[in-house]
């Protein structure tokens, strides 16, 4: 059998054709002593097909907690013994958060709400926030508001939402182990409508929720079929009181192999470091990830957990001589 890294070099690096599901599994199964070679190849692929720029994004939780869904990893579910809840953010708070995000050099600001899908009150608050931000801050606005109807997709597009995030979370075959209150197909339908409306699609998931390597490879193939503009990669940070609260953190080498494997499966896609990387990888692992296929980061804190200080990520990018992606000139 041909060495999978030699195959990937010819197929992915030279021709820009992502690995298929079986090939991705072979990468995930590589022994740890091949990790450095794997990361180096993934970095070459990233530089060849995405370039040196790194997109920086900040996120804010407009509505925290009280969600009716049972996503087993999430402390914002109202169904678990993990009460995370706070008042809705008002418009001035959204604007101030966008300003602080822009000061880091970020070009993307994502407004997030813990809901199954937005109701009229939430959409009105989002619309008011977007209008105020666009009047005061030079930044692209993304949203993550759960599952949408066709009419809601159209309204968000008309508001000027640049990109919509809705994660598939995991492989289709593993989804019912993670969520039971809605289906994988419902999430897929929202993503399809978002693309049809002309917004960029942002879709990723969480690694380390008990899925097998085969299912991790399946998930990469699911994402390749969707072909999103951006894939955020999260690593499970077990939350007390949730069904996944007692799972072990993914070993760093396994997490880095996954990062590189997803890059080789998705050579032209923006691959973003998201939640959980602090406890899974630490500072050294963050550097290895950025030198192993990652070309986008979330700076600052996440929705319910602390992230690395924005300054630490920005200093790392500067040390690695990786420029922050400039704001789209069309804005």
Curated annotation (Swiss-Prot):
[4Fe-4S] cluster binds at residues 67, 71, 74. Keywords: 2Fe-2S, 4Fe-4S, Biotin biosynthesis, Iron, Iron-sulfur, Metal-binding, S-adenosyl-L-methionine, Transferase. It comes from the Bacteria. PROSITE patterns: RADICAL_SAM. Pathway: Cofactor biosynthesis; biotin biosynthesis; biotin from 7,8-diaminononanoate: step 2/2. Binds 1 [4Fe-4S] cluster. The cluster is coordinated with 3 cysteines and an exchangeable S-adenosyl-L-methionine. [2Fe-2S] cluster binds at residues 110, 143, 202, 272. Residues 52-277 form the Radical SAM core domain. Its EC number is 2.8.1.6. One of its GO terms (biological process) is biotin biosynthetic process. Gene3D superfamilies: Aldolase class I. Catalyzes the conversion of dethiobiotin (DTB) to biotin by the insertion of a sulfur atom into dethiobiotin via a radical-based mechanism. PANTHER family: BIOTIN SYNTHASE (PTHR22976), BIOTIN SYNTHASE, MITOCHONDRIAL (PTHR22976:SF2). Belongs to the radical SAM superfamily. Biotin synthase family. This is Biotin synthase. It comes from Mycobacterium sp. (strain KMS). The gene is bioB.
């Amino acid at each position: 059998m041909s060495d999978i890294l030699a195959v990937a070099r010819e197929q992915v690096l030279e021709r820009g054709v992502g690995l298929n599901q079986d090939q991705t599994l072979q990468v995930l199964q590589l022994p740890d002593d091949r990790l450095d070679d794997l990361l180096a190849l993934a970095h070459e692929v990233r530089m060849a097909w995405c370039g040196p720029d790194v997109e920086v994004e900040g996120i804010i939780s407009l509505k925290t907690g009280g969600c009716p869904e049972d996503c087993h990893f999430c402390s914002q579910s109202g169904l678990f013994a993990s009460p995370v809840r706070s008042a809705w953010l008002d418009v001035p708070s959204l604007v101030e958060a966008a300003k602080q995000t822009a000061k880091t050099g970020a070009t993307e600001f994502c407004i997030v709400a813990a809901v199954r899908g937005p109701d009229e009150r939430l959409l009105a608050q989002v619309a008011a926030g977007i209008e105020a931000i666009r009047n005061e801050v030079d930044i692209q606005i993304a949203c993550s508001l759960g599952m949408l109807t066709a009419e809601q997709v159209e309204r968000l597009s008309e508001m000027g939402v640049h990109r919509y995030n809705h994660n598939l979370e995991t492989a289709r075959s593993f989804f019912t182990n993670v969520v039971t209150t809605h289906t994988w197909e419902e999430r897929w339908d929202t993503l399809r409508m978002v693309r049809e409306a002309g917004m960029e699609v942002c879709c990723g998931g969480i690694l380390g929720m008990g899925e097998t390597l085969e299912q991790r490879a399946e998930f990469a193939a699911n994402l390749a079929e969707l072909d999103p503009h951006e894939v955020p990669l999260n690593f499970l940070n077990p939350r007390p009181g949730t069904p996944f609260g007692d799972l072990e953190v993914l070993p760093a080498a396994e997490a880095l192999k996954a990062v590189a494997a997803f890059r080789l499966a998705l050579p032209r896609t923006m691959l973003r470091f998201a939640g959980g990387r602090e406890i899974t990888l630490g500072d050294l692992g963050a550097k290895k990830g950025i030198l192993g296929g990652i070309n986008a980061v979330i700076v600052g804190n996440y929705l319910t957990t602390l992230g690395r200080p924005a300054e630490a990520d920005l200093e790392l990018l500067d040390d690695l001589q990786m420029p922050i992606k400039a704001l789209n000139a069309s804005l």
